[in-house]
Amino acid sequence: MANQPSIAERRTKVWEPYIRAKLGFRNHWYPVRLASEIAEGTPVPVKLLGEKILLNRVGGKVYAIQDRCLHRGVTLSDRVECYSKNTISCWYHGWTYRWDDGRLVDILTNPGSVQIGRRALKTFPVEEAKGLIFVYVGDGEPTPLIEDVPPGFLDENRAIHGQHRLVASNWRLGAENGFDAGHVLIHKNSILVKGNDIILPLGFAPGDPDQLTRSEVAAGKPKGVYDLLGEHSVPVFEGMIEGKPAIHGNIGSKRVAISISIWLPGVLKVEPWPDPELTQFEWYVPVDETSHLYFQTLGKVVTSKEAADSFEREFHEKWVGLALNGFNDDDIMARESMEPFYTDDRGWSEEILFEPDRAIIEWRGLASQHNRGIQEAR
């Protein structure tokens, strides 16, 4: 009798598209920079889903082109040379491309070349929303941005501020770390816990497995999973070792993180967080196979310019240090510590999951089934 596949092999087969997606999912929108970081006429290189991309703001509008000359493949951003507002010239042989459509319009070293007008760099759709620059890597016409951000992110009266940093782990470890309700133990000593007097247990003892998640997959809308562990479990505030109390959670005055959800292509929404009037939206943007851009934003509903200005000051003066760094630095440590275990893909079959991981399992399944394409290494 032939050897039967193990439970781990059968399980990972269900997630096979997710496991293949080391470089992320194609045909989706991703934030790559804050809008304020792309100044007029100042090209900025980024890497997204393994592709080198060059951004520039021309006449107020941001464009994105392939950061590689068609001639000999050198990286344009290694030495940026722009001799006109609307073009960039390769520093090696002077091939000159337009920012808006990537078209090769001149060659400084051979003005009569037959290649002029016949070639073009790859371009990428760009949208600027809520102070972020989103880039679409894919084929054909892009889907509406609203389908690739969590519900509520684009609400007209919601002000958004954020920051980003590079993390040395695959994007999926970032997504699963953020969506892992059972990992709150690592935050027990965070300055946010006492500094903002929040309620933070050590973990959760799950109830009925069938009530722990809810998925949203309607056509034309964002697709994601809600973690209902907080609603259908018993919070653990006292950690026991061999029958004796060892550590304790924090019973503060502020209840936060009531609703936690994750959405394609890899963005978490925690509401409210880190304060009852705030919502955290954070992306795990694939850079390459072993790193991701951790794009953290906080949103607040504001009804006046004064309120918007006050939130902006509060974001920079309080929440960056107390929450985005003071709390989430623990998450970065966990992701980078997991990376070696999953780098060669063996971790997906060797991991041993437990009851609170139900939401992660649902996320893997939803992402495998509803992504719009897998980015392959080029």
Curated annotation (Swiss-Prot):
Taxon lineage: Bacteria, Pseudomonadati, Pseudomonadota, Alphaproteobacteria, Sphingomonadales
Oligomeric and partner information: Homotrimer. Carbazole 1,9a-dioxygenase complex consists of a terminal oxygenase component CarAa, a ferredoxin reductase component fdr and a ferredoxin component CarAc.
Keywords, in A-Z order: 2Fe-2S, Dioxygenase, Iron, Iron-sulfur, Metal-binding, NAD, NADP, Oxidoreductase
Organism: Sphingomonas sp
PROSITE patterns registered for this protein in UniProt: RIESKE
GO biological process: carbazole catabolic process
EC id: 1.14.12.22
PANTHER family (alphabetical): BLR4922 PROTEIN (PTHR21266:SF59), IRON-SULFUR DOMAIN CONTAINING PROTEIN (PTHR21266)
Cofactor note: Binds 1 [2Fe-2S] cluster per subunit.
Domain of life: Bacteria
Amino-acid positions noted as binding [2Fe-2S] cluster in the UniProt annotation, renumbered to this chain: 69, 71, 90, 93
Catalytic function, reaction form: 9H-carbazole + NADH + O2 + H(+) = 2'-aminobiphenyl-2,3-diol + NAD(+); 9H-carbazole + NADPH + O2 + H(+) = 2'-aminobiphenyl-2,3-diol + NADP(+)
CDD domains per UniProt: RHO_alpha_C_DMO-like (cd08878), Rieske_RO_Alpha_OMO_CARDO (cd03548)
Pfam families with a match to the protein in the record: Aromatic_hydrox, Rieske
Role noted for this protein: Part of the multicomponent carbazole 1,9a-dioxygenase (CARDO), that converts carbazole (CAR) into 2-aminobiphenyl-2,3-diol.
GO molecular function, one term: 2 iron, 2 sulfur cluster binding
Class of the enzyme per the UniProt entry, highest EC level: oxidoreductase
Required cofactor names: [2Fe-2S] cluster
Protein name listed in UniProt: Carbazole 1,9a-dioxygenase, terminal oxygenase component CarAa
Coiled coil start-end: none
Domain Rieske: 29-135
SUPFAM superfamilies: Bet v1-like, ISP domain
